[in-house]
Amino acid sequence: MIRRIPNDQGIKMKRWGIVPSLVAVLFASFAWADGDHGAHTPKMAAPFWVWAVGLGVLTVVVLILIRQAKRGTLMSERFRGFSRNARLLLIRSPFSGLSVSLIRLLFNLYLLAVGFDMLFVAKFAAINWTCHGLSVIPSGILSDLFGRRRVFLLAYTGNLLATTAIVFVTDPTWLLILAAVIGLFEGGHAIVGPPFMVEQSRPDERVHLFSLNGGIQVGAASLGNLAAGVLPLAFAALFDIGPESAWARRAALMCGLPIMLLSMIPIYLIREEWRPMNIRRWVEGIENYGRIGMLALTEGLVGLGLGFSAPFFNIFFDQHLKASTAQIGLIFALGSILTAMVTLFVPIVVHRLGRVRTVTFVKLLGIPSLILLGMSYDIVWAGAMYVITILLIGGPFPNKGISDPIYTLFAMEVVKERERGTTNGIMHAFVEFPMGIGAALAGPFMAAGDWQTPYMIGGGIFAVAFILYYLYFVRIDGREPVLQPATAS
C-alpha cells in the first residue's frame, strides 16, 4: 500500500523560501566585498552581521533537516524500522560531513597562506588521493574477511592523528609524507559505510535510507563550509590578525579535529555480528566480474575527470577570482544546503525513471556547468556555476551530487553480499587513484593561470564515463528492479 502524502504544501513553500534569502545574503557579500584583491590583503569581505545572519540561517536549516530526518518526517514519509546500526550510521553523518567539509575547504588555502605555491598544493593533493586509492582495495578485502567496524576504527584513529599533525607541521617533506599517511588511512575507513548500510536495511527502504544519509551528510557539510568561511574572521578579530593569514586558518582547522573524534563514537557503539570468512571461500565467491569491472571503469574515468578540477575548487575561487575565505565558505555552503534539500526528493525521480537513467541524466546535465565554471571570470557567475555543478555532478566527499546516493546503492545491490566490501573498495580505488593522476596533471595548468583547459578535459572524460555506465547497466536495472513503495505502518 502506498502511503498518501499529507497536504502540507504551505510548510514546504516556507522551507524553500529560505533559499532566496540565502542568495540575497550571498549577493550582499559581493556588493560589500573589496573589488581590488590584487595584493590579496586580508580584509573582511562584508560587515560581520552579514556573515552572522548567513551562519544563523544555514544553521537553522541544517538543524531542521537533521531533526526531521531523525523523526522521519521528510517527504511526508516516516522512515521506521531502521536497525540500531543503521541509526548509528545516520547519527555519524552530520559529524562526518561537518568535519571533512571544514578541513577540506580550508587546508589548501592554509598551505597557500603558509607560503607554498600552487605546484606544491597540487603535489600534496595528488599524493593524498593516490595513496587513498592504493589502500582501499586491501581495506575492502580486510573488511569482508574480518569485519567493517574493526577496520574502520583502526583506520580512523590513524587518520585523526595524521590530520592533527598536518595542522602544525610546516616542513614540506613531512607534509608530503603525512599526505601519503592520511591517504592510506582514509582508504581504510571510507569502505565501511555503503556495504554496512545495505546489510542493515531492507530492499524496500534502501533508496530512502541512502538518500536520507546523503541529505544529512551534505546538509552538515553546508554548515562546515560556512564555518570555514566565518571561523577565520572570528579568530582574526579575537587575536588581531588578518582573516586570510595562516594563523587564522590554522585555528579554524583545529576546530575540525574534535568533530572528527565525535564522528568516530557511533561506529564504536555499533554491534557488529560478524563471522570470519575463509579466504578460499571468499575468492571462490567472487562471481560478478563483469559488473565489478564496469563499476571500476566508470569510477576510474570519473576520478580522472574530477581530478582536473574538484580538488581545487577552493583554490580556483581564491587564486583566479580573488575571493575571500568568507565568500568561498558561503558559496560552498549554499551548494551543500541546496544539494541536501534536493537529494531528499531524488527517490521520486528514481521511481519514474529508474536508478541508472536517473544517475546518467543528472550527471550528464551537470557537465556544461563544470566547463562554464572553468571559463568564469566573475565571482557571481562562477558561484552560480559551482552550485549547479555540485548539485548535478558533485565533488570529493562530502560534497556529493544529488544522484550519488542512488549510484552507490545500485552498485551495492548488483553484487553479492560477500562481494560488497571488495566492490566498494575497488570503486574507491579506481576513483581516488585516477583523481590523484588528474590532480597532478592539472597542477601545471593552474600554476600557469590556465583554468579552462583542465575543466574542459575533465568534463569530456566525465561524459564518456557515464555514457559507458548507461550502456552497460540500463538493461540490468530493468531486469532487476528493487525500488518498491513503502508500506504503511
Ranges and model annotations:
Residues 157-170, 365-378:
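C-terminal ends and interior cores of transmembrane alpha-helices
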Residues 40-51, 233-257, 444-462:
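A membrane-interface helix-boundary motif in multi-pass transporters
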Residues 72-130, 293-332:
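Helix-loop boundary and gating motifs at the non-cytosolic
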